[in-house]
Structures are given as C-alpha cells and as structure tokens.
Regions:
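Mature catalytic core of soluble alpha/beta enzymes
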Residues: 1-220
Length: 220
C-alpha cells in the first residue's frame, strides 16, 4: 500500500495509471472516495504529486514556487479516480470471474498515507481474532489498535504525546478496550527553510502545508 515501495500495488498503479486491483486496494480506494466526499475534498488521496513536489516522501525537502504548486495542484481531484467493482458487472457474472479495475486521471498519482495505517490496524485485529487472540495491542506509529482488554481484564493505557515535547513527553493517557487511537500532527514530519516551518500535512485546496492552530489531533 506504499506509494514509495516499488513492489507495492499503489506504486504500480501510480506508474501505469490503471491496474487490476486486489480487494485491499479496492477497499482503500472506495473508502478514500467516501472520505473525499464527506470532507468536501479536504481529504484527497490524489495529493501525492504535491507531496512529492515538497519532498516529503523522500526527505529531499524543497519549497516550490507558486507556479510549481499550481501545476501539480491541477492533478489533484479525487473525483477522477474510477473503479469498476465486481458488483458493477453489467453481464451479471459471478464475482469470482471478474476482477476490480482501477483507473486514475491523466498524470494522477495516489497516496494512502492518511488512511493505510488505520486500515492495516483493523485488518490485523480481525486476523488476530480469527486465530483466537483476545488480548493484544497493535502499534503502527501514531495508530494504536487495541484488541479486547489486558489479560488481567483491565483497560489498555495509551499515552498521547505532547506535540511541544520530546518522544517521552505526554499530555495525557487514555484507557481503551477494543478501540483504535489515532494521533497525527505536524510535529513529526516537517522541515525549516529561511525561518519558516513547513509540515507534511498538505491542504489539497491550496497545495501548501495546512495552516491553523491545531498542533495535534487524536481520534478514538
């Protein structure tokens, strides 16, 4: 699901512009399109060309010109991502006989960095439970997935990092059972140039890092 891993499905889709998709990729694309609609375009997984322009995927940071931003921003449009699912087979063939086919708009590229960890956490929780695991805590960076409770029946404790502090500085601790805790903020990935700080959370309407008062957001 990584846009940077040359062996991933997403990488192949970005290179080719279309792809016969697995169920995982299909589910992510459909969910991404739902969130795109729900947020009126503030979440848009076709933002990848703009992310690359700023250098966030590679670490080769660069403050682009306004013209460069506008050129890449013209490619960002979640409505142009099309997917033909098994259910849309006009001939009514059995689902096993028809694969899903994904097509991007011209020169578009996608990045599931905003939802892939949460999706992976959910799938891991489902897999563990299928194998009888009733107590576990899955950590995927800023995404924590709790399965059940601790073996002693008590709640899991998940620390929320202080965005103004270090790695071990916390602003609070949450008690969770069979829940996911997701935290994101610009304090983890950013660069500075000419006295300005540029975070990795890009506004798909402007092509520039999001500018606001929120340092960190946690969703349970």
């Amino acid at each position: 699901l990584s846009a940077e891993n040359s062996k991933s499905e997403v990488y192949a889709l970005n290179e080719q512009g279309n792809l016969q998709a697995t169920d995982d990729l299909e589910e992510l694309i459909l969910r991404g399109k739902e969130i795109y609609q729900e947020t009126d375009g503030l979440f848009d997984d076709t933002i990848y060309p703009v992310m690359k322009l700023w250098g966030f995927p590679t670490g080769n940071y660069h403050v682009p010109t306004a013209a460069e931003v506008q050129k890449k921003l013209a490619l960002v449009d979640g409505n142009k991502v099309e997917i033909q699912t098994r259910d849309s087979d006009e001939k009514g063939r059995d689902s096993k006989e028809k694969a899903n086919f994904v097509t991007l708009g011209a020169d578009q590229q996608i990045d599931f960095g905003g939802i892939a960890k949460g999706y992976t956490g959910q799938k891991l929780a489902e897999l563990f439970q299928e194998y009888g695991v009733s107590s576990a805590l899955v950590s995927l960076g800023g995404n924590i997935q709790a399965i059940g409770t601790k073996p002693d029946g008590s709640s899991w404790k998940v620390g929320i990092r202080d965005p103004k502090g270090g790695q071990q500085d916390y602003i609070g601790v949450l008690s969770v059972e069979s829940q996911a805790v997701v935290t994101s903020g610009g304090y983890e990935r950013y660069f500075e140039e000419d006295g300005e700080t540029y975070i990795h959370i890009i506004n798909p309407r402007t092509g520039y890092p999001a500018d606001g008062d929120l340092l960190s957001v946690t969703i349970v």
